[in-house]
């Protein structure tokens, strides 16, 4: 499935139905009086967040969205039926912008609803204008038009852990080993062309990991493909920095990513970081320990070792869970098998 994280769409809420101007006509009743009913309201267009959706792909094929109009009122004081609302499911983390780029709302919670376009109010029938001095009003009102607008949707993935690093560092392999994510894995740069999500369940606790496409120097300026996905890192609680230990200069590799994060958004460089030296099976133990010590002295952080041959799931997933509890104030996602 294609990953779409931006879309521009046209919304047209339903128009309100017109009020009715009519008079009661029955045998032997000479002056039946006004009995025109009200028009129905136009349908709204509502966005609704769901964890079952993780892309804006729907809007590639549906760029014009219209809600039903309200029906007009009729005689015998019958009100017209309201138009049906259009409810559109979007991923958690979807932001709505107007055409000028101003943020309208940020849908960052599960089952959150937002009326993006309000339907028009129904018109008033002449029965409502009857007074003691005006016993036979003919006046009625037309229904109001529904809102009509263009909006821009932008998706920022919400995940517990964002996996970052240079191209071909082994990020996708790490995600696949810790979760059931079916990401493409190959021995060449830019294998990952779009973010991938994986879910790890540890002691009935759910952790969402996001594999972000590889960053290169100048990514914040548009170099490579990482710049369009840097925004997805903003909502990660923890950054998992994967470094290829076979590189000659691992300090340069580390600082390259740190600079790109800082250039894009200074707050990204302040996030809790977890560093992993990957592909350790390609070097002997002495070389690994030397590079681990060099990186540890430079970053003043604990460095963890990983390889494709080692079972990383029990150790690293448990460690990620501990860091998540320690450094975030958010409640962990509790897996509920009945919440489908």
Curated annotation (Swiss-Prot):
Top EC class for this record: hydrolase
Cofactor or coenzyme needed: Mg(2+)
Binding site for Mg(2+): 172, 192
Entry EC number(s): 3.6.5.-
GO MF annotation: an example: magnesium ion binding
Principal subcellular localisation of the protein: cytoplasm
Annotated OBG-type G domain residues: 159-325
GO-annotated cellular components: cytoplasm
Keyword Nucleus applies: no
UniProt domain Obg: residue ranges: 1-158
Oligomeric and partner information: Monomer.
Role summary: An essential GTPase which binds GTP, GDP and possibly (p)ppGpp with moderate affinity, with high nucleotide exchange rates and a fairly low GTP hydrolysis rate. Plays a role in control of the cell cycle, stress response, ribosome biogenesis and in those bacteria that undergo differentiation, in morphogenesis control.
Cross-referenced HAMAP family: GTPase_Obg
Protein's recorded name: GTPase Obg
Name of encoding gene: obg
